[in-house]
Amino acid sequence: KDKNKKNTYDGKISLNFPGSEINTKYKIIDNLISINSEKSNLKKNNISYEGIISASPFYYNINVNLESLNILKFIENLSKLNHLLDEKILLDKKVNGTILLNVDYLKGIKIFDKAKIKINFVNGKLILNDSLLISNKIGKMYFNNSFIEIVEDRKILKSKIFFEIESQKKLYQKLQIPKKNRIKLENIYLEVEKDLDIDEIIINKFIFNKQITNTSLQKSIDLSDSLDINEINSLKNWIEVKKFSKNIFSNLD
C-alpha cells in the first residue's frame, strides 16, 4: 500500500429554507476538510464563508462575511441557543476552533455600523478577544479579556470593553447631550459581567477617559460606584438610553 497516497473527496452540500439558500463546496484530503460558500444568502442577506476543519486533532478555522446583521435579533437568538454552551457541547475542552465574523452593516443598534466578531473556543472557554464594533463617524469599541466560561454550573460572560472615541462631537449629537454638559471625552472603559441565565448585567467598572498612557491630557472620571445598576437593566429603548446618558453628563462635577 502506498503510504503517500492521500484519500481525496469533493462535493457540494445545499441547504434551502424560507428566505435562505446555503451552498457549500467541500474538499476532503485525509483528515482535513476545506469548505467554501457558493452564491449563498441567509434571510435574503448575502453571506460568504471559507475555512478548514481538521478531524484529528479536531479544530476549525472559519471566516464568515455577512452583508448585514440585526444585532438585537442575533443576541436574542444566542440566548435561545444558550443550552449549546455546555461542557458536553460547545464548551467541551476537546472542541477548539476559531470563527471570524465580518459584518458590513449592523441593524438594530444606533451608534455602530460594522462589526468584526472573533469567536475562539479554547479548552472549555468561548473567548471573544479582538472583537470590534465600528462606528464610521464616532469611533471603535474593542472587546478585551472577553470570554464565557462555566463556573459552578453557571455560564458567565466577562468582558473588558474600551470605546475609543474619534469624534466626541458626533457622539454627543447622537446622544443629544447639551453643550453645557459636555466634557473632553477620549474614551469610555467598562468591565461587565453577566450570568447568561439571568436577564441582568453587572458593571464593575465605568470610567471616562481611562488613562492608557502617561501622555493622556484628560482627567480620568470613575463612575463605577455611582451607577444605578437597576436603572441600567431596566433600559428598554434608545429614548431611555439617551435620557440615562443625559443624566450622567448633567451630574458630572
Q: What role is predicted for each listed range?
A:
Residues 1-253:
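Membrane-proximal interfacial segments on either side of biological membranes
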